[in-house]
Amino acid sequence: DKVMLPGDFIAMRLTGDVRTTESGLSEGIIWDFTAGRPAEILLNYYGIDQGLLAATVPTFGFQGEVTPEAAGLTGLQPGTPVCYRAGDQPNNAFSLNVLNPGEIAATAGTSGVVYGVSDQVKYDPQSRVNTFVHVNHSPEAIRNGILLCVNGTGIMNAWMKQVAGENLKYHEMNEMAACVKPGSEGLLILPFGNGAERVLG
């Protein structure tokens, strides 16, 4: 009877406890960054019972213990503490040691993602970027992740490889692209292979 993100569900299966994190709620766009609590105005507007939200636990910190049943299914030891969970982009930034204001993680998979850390509570009125509570956020040291997603960038890169010649390696494509003057003589490619994204605002 609770709303869960995938990481919350996995932790629930391991521990038997239904919990979430502030970062998780922010991924679901139901976090009030100014008040530091679930976004009641949004929940009320859509008629969502706040009781559907699980209690929060810290992103880093004790979140429960592996149950005997989960231990039997996974091979983990019963009582093993579960001490961390986060979503894909906060995890990616964490894995790249992007933890402090001004630091940025940029990756290109299916989509192209730029994720920067800020100590400011701001938002984009045109909704071109998402804001997340970052993995190391605390009331004393604000750490928000600002995420720009260009949907389909990786797919567009693969398409360019097919067009430019399948024998080229991606690093060779990058070297060729580096020789092109800024502006590409007016050539534009909108890398939205999966459909338009919000950056078009």
Predicted regions and their residues:
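Active-site core segments that coordinate phosphate-bearing ligands/cofactors
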Residues: 1-19, 24, 29-47, 68-201
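Electropositive nucleic-acid engagement tracts
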Residues: 50
